Amino acid sequence: MVHFTAEEKAAIASLWGQVNVEETGGEALGRLLVVYPWTQRFFDTFGNLSSASAIMGNPRVKAHGKKVLTSFGDAVKNLDNLKGTFAKLSELHCDKLHVDPENFRLLGNVLVIVLANHFGKEFTPQVQAAWQKMVTGVANALAYKYH
C-alpha cells in the first residue's frame, strides 16, 4: 500500500482540479504510442497509427486517452485504496487484454511529462514527486492481478 502525506494529497488534488482530462489524456496516450511503438499492438482497432501525426490526431486515441485519464480521477479520490480502486481494471488488463504491466509504468511516466509540459512552473519538484508517487501506485495497482 502506498502512503500519501496530507501535503502530497493536496498537491495531487490541486493540480487535478486544473487538468483538462480530454486534452491531457489524449496527449499522454498518443505520446505513449509514439515513443513506445510496441504498445500500439494493443490498439489494432484504432485505425491509422502509422506516424506521430496520425497517432496524435487519431480520434480513437484521444477518446481512449480521456477514458484512461478519467480513471486517474478515481485514483485522486481514492489515494488510500489504489489496489481496490483498480482491481477490476487490473483483472481486465491481465486476463482479457493481456497487457504487459510494464506499459502501466510507461504511461504513468509519460503522463508526468505531459503534466509538466502543461503546467510549467506550477509543476514544482514537490508536485512532480507527489504525482510520480501516484502514477507508480496506480501502475502497481493495475499490475496486481499479474502477481
UniProtKB/Swiss-Prot annotation:
<dbReference type="GO" id="GO:0072562">
    <property type="term" value="C:blood microparticle"/>
</dbReference>
<dbReference type="Pfam" id="PF00042">
    <property type="entry name" value="Globin"/>
</dbReference>
<dbReference type="GO" id="GO:0043177">
    <property type="term" value="F:organic acid binding"/>
</dbReference>
<feature type="binding site" description="proximal binding residue">
    <location>
        <position position="93"/>
    </location>
    <ligand>
        <name>heme b</name>
    </ligand>
</feature>
<dbReference type="GO" id="GO:0046872">
    <property type="term" value="F:metal ion binding"/>
</dbReference>
<dbReference type="InterPro" id="IPR000971">
    <property type="entry name" value="Globin"/>
</dbReference>
<dbReference type="InterPro" id="IPR050056">
    <property type="entry name" value="Hemoglobin_oxygen_transport"/>
</dbReference>
<dbReference type="GO" id="GO:0020037">
    <property type="term" value="F:heme binding"/>
</dbReference>
<dbReference type="InterPro" id="IPR009050">
    <property type="entry name" value="Globin-like_sf"/>
</dbReference>
<dbReference type="GO" id="GO:0004601">
    <property type="term" value="F:peroxidase activity"/>
</dbReference>
<keyword id="KW-0813">Transport</keyword>
<feature type="binding site" description="distal binding residue">
    <location>
        <position position="64"/>
    </location>
    <ligand>
        <name>heme b</name>
    </ligand>
</feature>
<comment type="similarity">
    <text>Belongs to the globin family.</text>
</comment>
<dbReference type="InterPro" id="IPR002337">
    <property type="entry name" value="Hemoglobin_b"/>
</dbReference>
<dbReference type="InterPro" id="IPR012292">
    <property type="entry name" value="Globin/Proto"/>
</dbReference>
<keyword id="KW-0479">Metal-binding</keyword>
<dbReference type="GO" id="GO:0031838">
    <property type="term" value="C:haptoglobin-hemoglobin complex"/>
</dbReference>
<keyword id="KW-0408">Iron</keyword>
<dbReference type="GO" id="GO:0005833">
    <property type="term" value="C:hemoglobin complex"/>
</dbReference>
<comment type="function">
    <text>Gamma chains make up the fetal hemoglobin F, in combination with alpha chains.</text>
</comment>
<keyword id="KW-0349">Heme</keyword>
<comment type="subunit">
    <text>Heterotetramer of two alpha chains and two gamma chains in fetal hemoglobin (Hb F).</text>
</comment>
<keyword id="KW-0561">Oxygen transport</keyword>
<dbReference type="GO" id="GO:0042744">
    <property type="term" value="P:hydrogen peroxide catabolic process"/>
</dbReference>
<dbReference type="GO" id="GO:0019825">
    <property type="term" value="F:oxygen binding"/>
</dbReference>
<dbReference type="GO" id="GO:0005344">
    <property type="term" value="F:oxygen carrier activity"/>
</dbReference>
<protein>
    <recommendedName>
        <fullName>Hemoglobin subunit gamma</fullName>
    </recommendedName>
</protein>
<dbReference type="GO" id="GO:0031720">
    <property type="term" value="F:haptoglobin binding"/>
</dbReference>
<feature type="domain" description="Globin">
    <location>
        <begin position="3"/>
        <end position="147"/>
    </location>
</feature>
